[in-house]
């Protein structure tokens, strides 16, 4: 985007693909380095630690995380291209097996084969080509911290806060003006912590609000309307941007009414690096 703004390039095709489901899993078969000493061999272990810390600090109920999983599956069930289209009830979520306690199976994202691509261009170029469906980028932020989860000063405050602050400042809008959020949902706890890091609720209150007021298109915060990583596809990143663009064009399978601004999050590691994107309505 900066290269386009600087006039260095006119267009950029951004692509991603992965075979996480059918490809080699050799890198996950045994722990390495310091993680091996502690018997910690998966990304999920880091998130389980964060999930446990969240429950302990805020006395969070299992139903709070279930509200995230149920909303994602409800949206995925209405998406004909979603990998996981079976609806999930809160009772079924609570009855699900633990994989890495306190995380249950439905707290964890899918493993998927897939790919995605977006075309990035300048406003002038889009106008010259007569593209009235182009979705404008209003704000972008990025921040990161220690890769090692145990070295962070606070497990429940990620660099999502700094990333969002930059993006909202660039966009020049308030948090309550957001029409929907496409949040990186590798695990349900990630969604609750991102909501709080973004300043959409006070600390420790995202789960209760999600349970009471909903994350569907008619709820408090329409969330991951394609099903996200929990239901549509575990192929991370670009699909959330694509769904945000569809929403802002009025082309989504589960459509928010008259959206003006869309919020997208992305991250890597165990909440190690974070990016925030704010998009505006097409046209």
Model-derived features: positions:
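Acidic, glycine-rich active-site loops and adjacent beta-strand->loop/helix elements
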Residues: 16-21, 71-72, 141-144, 184-188, ...
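Condensing-enzyme catalytic core mediating Claisen C-C bond formation in acyl metabolism
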Residues: 66-67, 98-162, 166, 212-226, ...
């Amino acid at each position: 985007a900066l290269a386009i703004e600087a006039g260095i390039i006119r267009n950029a095709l951004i692509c991603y693909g992965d075979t996480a489901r059918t490809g080699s899993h050799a890198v996950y078969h045994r722990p390495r380095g310091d993680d091996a000493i502690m018997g910690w061999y998966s990304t999920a272990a880091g998130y389980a630690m964060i999930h446990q810390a969240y429950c302990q600090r805020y006395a969070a109920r299992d139903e709070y995380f279930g509200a995230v999983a149920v909303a994602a599956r409800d949206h995925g069930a209405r998406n004909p291209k979603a990998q996981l289209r079976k609806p999930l009830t809160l009772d079924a979520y609570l009855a699900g097996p633990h994989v890495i306690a306190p995380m249950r199976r439905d707290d964890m994202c899918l493993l998927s084969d897939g790919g995605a691509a977006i075309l990035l261009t300048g406003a002038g170029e889009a106008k010259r080509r007569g593209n009235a469906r182009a979705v404008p980028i209003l704000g972008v932020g990025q921040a990161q911290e220690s890769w090692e989860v145990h070295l962070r000063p606070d497990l429940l405050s990620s660099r999502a806060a700094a990333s969002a602050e930059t993006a909202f400042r660039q966009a020049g809008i308030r948090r309550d003006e957001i029409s929907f959020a496409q949040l990186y949902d590798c695990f349900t706890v990630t969604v609750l912590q991102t909501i709080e890091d973004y300043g959409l609720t006070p600390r420790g209150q995202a789960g209760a609000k999600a349970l009471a007021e909903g994350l569907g298109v008619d709820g408090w915060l329409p969330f991951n309307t394609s099903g996200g990583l929990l239901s549509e596809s575990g192929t991370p990143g670009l699909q959330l941007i694509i769904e945000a663009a569809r929403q802002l064009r009025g082309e989504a399978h589960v459509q928010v009414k008259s959206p003006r601004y869309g919020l997208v999050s992305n991250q890597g590691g165990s909440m190690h690096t974070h990016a925030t994107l704010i998009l505006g309505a097409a046209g």
